[in-house]
Regions:
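Short glycine-enriched loops at secondary-structure junctions
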Residues: 112-113, 138-145
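Active-site mouth loops of central-metabolism enzymes
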Residues: 106-118, 158-166
Length: 233
């Protein structure tokens, strides 16, 4: 009995030690103790970006009810761990529209990434490639199709709005095809621009007008974020 308890104790200690080593390995992947999860990244973005820029990426239309419900829907998705079952290998690979992916999800298109960081699309494309998935470039990304392709050897898709008519769309599709983009995502959910109340409060329209006197009351948002300003100089 003592031998059995001793073996059991050694096994328990070994399991704990193994779990601690595994946890340490995961912890080592965190580059900064100040940025552990998405909420931490959001807070750092809030502190770095001008208010009008942060509210664009963080906000949504009108009372943001749909955005809130979307977040709630994702929070309902949980993992169901299964115990005492054979797991010879874990494989999340899949193929979507002819693109082989190491993970069953992609980096969705985000417009105006360049306003958050000058080479944002290029970095996002490289990050997607490193994770084994595809990056979808937005029509309003702020970087040329050819430049994003030059920045990443990974799979790329292109998200297309048709604001300039058929001729512009066809020319854009031809460029994406020539650059080796593997798929096309046609977006039809924005026939008109959304009423983004945060943008109105921040003076986005006045700032984008390019008229100094009109935008002057809102320029303080950039003055208090000198690091962001320096990125664009």
């Amino acid at each position: 009995a003592r031998r059995a308890r001793s073996c059991s104790s050694r096994a328990s200690i070994g399991s704990i030690s193994s779990a601690m080593r595994s946890e340490s390995a995961l912890a080592r992947q965190v580059r900064s103790p100040r940025v552990v999860n998405i909420a931490d990244l959001r807070e750092r973005a809030r502190r770095r970006l001008p208010g009008v820029v942060f509210d664009y990426i963080d906000g949504a239309a009108e009372d943001e009810v749909t955005e809130s419900r979307n977040r709630g829907a994702f929070s309902e998705v949980t993992f169901r761990p299964r115990q005492c079952v054979p797991v010879p290998a874990c494989d999340l690979k899949t193929t979507l529209l002819g693109t082989e992916l190491a993970l069953p999800f992609l980096l969705a298109p985000v417009g105006n990434i360049r306003s958050f960081y000058p080479m944002g699309d290029a970095h996002a494309a490289r990050a997607a490639h490193a994770a084994g998935t595809a990056f979808i470039q937005s029509t309003f990304s702020g970087m040329r199709i050819e430049d994003v392709r030059a920045a990443s050897a990974g799979p790329l898709w292109y998200q297309l709005y048709v604001p300039g008519g058929r001729a512009v769309a066809e020319a854009t599709i031809a460029r994406a095809r020539a650059a080796g983009y593997a798929a096309l995502m046609v977006t039809i959910d924005t026939p008109v621009a959304g009423l983004r109340e945060r943008d109105i409060r921040r003076g986005a329209r006045q700032i984008l007008s390019g008229q100094f006197l009109t935008s002057l009351p809102y320029l303080w948002q950039f003055v208090v974020r000198p690091r962001w300003v320096l990125d664009f100089l």
